[in-house]
Amino acid sequence: MSETIQLAQKLIQTESVTPNDNGCQTLIADYLKPLGFDIEPMPFGEVENLWARAGKDGPVIVFAGHTDVVPTGPEEKWTHPPFSAHIDADGIMYGRGTADMKSSIACFMVATKQFIKQYPDFKGSIAFLITSDEEGPAVNGTVKVIEALEARNEKFEYCLVGEPSSSNTLGDSIKNGRRGSLSGHLTIKGIQGHIAYPQLAENPIHTLSPALSDMVNKVWDKGNDYFPPTSFQVSNIHSGTGATNVIPGDCVVDFNFRFSTEQTPESLKAGIHQILDSHQLNYDLDWNLSGLPFITPADGELIQAVSKAIEQEMGTTPELSTGGGTSDGRFIAQTGAQVIELGPLNDTIHKIDERVSVSDLEKLTQIYRNTLINLLVT
C-alpha cells in the first residue's frame, strides 16, 4: 500500500468531528518536520490550527485544508464504518473525510515529500495552513491564521485549497473563484388576534407575501463571464402559535444571497430594504456576511501551473468554475493571493458512504507534485 493511502487512512481513522482535531495536526506536523518545515501551532479558542513552512524566500505556495469533518449521520446506514477508511475490492475507500478533505491533505503531504527529495534546492517556499474549524462556524480557523500572518507581514503568492472540486472525473474542474454569501434574518411584525376577527389583528404572513414575491422574482443581476446570476433563496419561514384559530403576531424568514462580483453586500441590502419599505412593513432585519466573491484570473501563474499538471497526469484540460458553496478560500483571497481549489470528486461529500477512489488519490498526489514543479522549478 502506498504512502499516500496509508496517510489518508490514518487521518480518516482519526475521528475529528468539527471543531475537534483529535491529533490529526500532530500527525501532519510529525510528517513535515523531518522535511525541513518549521512547525507553528496556532490555536484560537477551542480550534486547533497549524502553520508549517519550508523555505524563507518567495514565491510561496500554501496548501490550505481542514482536518474537521461533519457528523456521520446514522452509522448503521454506512456500508462500512465511517471512521474505518475501509478499502473494498474495487479500490474504493469509505469514510467520513475521504473526499472532504483528509485525502487531499495526505496527497499534498506525500507530493511535498517527493518534490523536496527530487528538488532539495527549489526556489521559493511551501507552506501548509490546516484548521479544524471549516465545517463549523469558521471564526477561529483560517481567518484567524490569516490575520496573524498579516500582522507580522508574512505574505504568500499562491494558495491551493484541497477541497473536492472534481465533478465526473479527477481534475475535470478547477474552482478559480467563489460567489459571496450574505444571509438575512427577517422578522415581520404583525398584531396577534382571533382568526374570526381579522379586523382586530394584522396578519404578518399576509403583509409579507407581496414583498416576498418581489424579492423572489427580482432579477438581481445577469452574472458575468466568471459568475452565474446572483441567487436569492428562502431557507426557513416560521410563524404561528401552533393553534389553528390564532392570527400570528410575527413571521420570521431566513434567506440567503449567493452573489457575484456584479453586486456588493451594500447593494443587496439596499435592494431588500427598498422592497420592504415600499410595502410599508414593520420589520427587523439582521444581516450576516460570511464571504465576499473572489476570482483568480485564468492567465495567472497558479491556474497555468495547475492546468498543466492536470494535463500531464490525466491528459485532459480542466474547466474553470465558480459554482458550489463557500470555502476557506474566501478568507485567503482577501490577502491578494491567487487562490484555486483542486481535489477529489465531490459527489459523495457529507453523505452516507462518503468515498473516494484509491487510484484517484495516487493521481492527485502526482498532480500536486507536478504543480509544485511547474511553480517552483520550471
Curated annotation (Swiss-Prot):
Cofactor binding summary note: Binds 2 Zn(2+) or Co(2+) ions per subunit.
Keyword terms of this UniProt record: Amino-acid biosynthesis, Cobalt, Diaminopimelate biosynthesis, Hydrolase, Lysine biosynthesis, Metal-binding, Zinc
Stored InterPro entries: ArgE/DapE_CS, Bact_exopeptidase_dim_dom, DapE_proteobac, Peptidase_M20, Peptidase_M20_dimer, Peptidase_M20A
Source taxon at top rank: Bacteria
Cysteine pairings via disulfide bonds: none
Keyword Zinc: yes
Known cofactor(s): Zn(2+); Co(2+)
EC number: 3.5.1.18
Record-annotated active site: 68, 134
Residues that span the membrane, as ranges: none
Family matches, as PROSITE patterns: ARGE_DAPE_CPG2_2
Example of a GO MF term: acetylornithine deacetylase activity
Family: Belongs to the peptidase M20A family. DapE subfamily.
Function field: Catalyzes the hydrolysis of N-succinyl-L,L-diaminopimelic acid (SDAP), forming succinate and LL-2,6-diaminopimelate (DAP), an intermediate involved in the bacterial biosynthesis of lysine and meso-diaminopimelic acid, an essential component of bacterial cell walls.
Complexes and interactors: Homodimer.
Name of the protein in question: Succinyl-diaminopimelate desuccinylase
Source organism (scientific name): Hydrogenovibrio crunogenus (strain DSM 25203 / XCL-2) (Thiomicrospira crunogena)
